[in-house]
């Protein structure tokens, strides 16, 4: 649940004590559980997978990548038969409360099967498991847990500048002058319209 929807008291407590995970209550539990693990201890959780990718969880990812070592079964949607639809997408992960230099985690991608049994069978087959160096995620802006990328992509992120450092982004898919370029259908004079042209040349000839 979004912490902002849980009332002023909870929202205030979370903002004060869990700055890095305040985007959602489940991510607060991720951070809180980390505080309860002894150094070198292990902990397993099943949570929504949004913390792996979204910007609002970037600080939490950064903390986890620098303090924990992680292995994962990325479950995706329909991991539990009791929960239908694509809305709830989950991941199961085990983390060790210690940072290991050059640690390679195992990540099983189980997002494609649409049933609980299908995901279990795919996991046991071992055909969709990746071994990824956790430190490589740091090379990607925003630090998403993109475990399926090959080494060449991580090298490109390390060597090449990002687009944001090279160009200025502005509004996309906009005419910048709607009064000049856009017309509502009722504004067009039917006598000047052509509905039989099959290409641009035909439309031009009909003028």
What are the residue ranges of the model-derived segments?
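C-terminal target-recognition/interaction regions appended to catalytic cores
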Residues: 193-207
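Signature of N6-adenine DNA methyltransferases within the class I
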Residues: 1-197
């Amino acid at each position: 649940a979004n912490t902002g929807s849980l009332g002023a008291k909870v929202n205030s407590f979370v903002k004060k004590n869990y700055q890095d995970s305040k985007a959602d209550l489940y991510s607060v539990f991720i951070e809180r559980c980390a505080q309860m693990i002894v150094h070198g201890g292990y902990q397993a959780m099943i949570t929504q997978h949004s913390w792996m990718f979204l910007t609002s969880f970037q600080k939490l990812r950064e903390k986890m990548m620098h303090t924990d070592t992680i292995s994962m079964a990325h479950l995706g949607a329909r991991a539990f038969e009791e929960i239908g639809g694509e809305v709830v997408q989950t991941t199961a992960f085990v983390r060790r409360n210690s940072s290991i230099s050059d640690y390679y985690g195992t990540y099983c991608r189980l997002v494609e099967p649409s049933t609980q049994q299908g995901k279990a069978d795919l996991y046991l087959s071992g055909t969709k498991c990746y071994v990824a160096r956790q430190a490589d995620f740091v090379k990607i802006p925003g630090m998403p847990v993109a475990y399926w990328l090959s080494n060449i992509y991580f090298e490109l992120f390390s060597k090449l500048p990002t687009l944001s450092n090279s160009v200025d982004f502005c509004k996309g898919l906009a005419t910048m002058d709607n009064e000049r370029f856009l017309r509502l259908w009722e504004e067009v004079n039917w006598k000047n319209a052509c509905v039989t042209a099959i290409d641009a040349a035909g439309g031009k000839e009909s003028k």
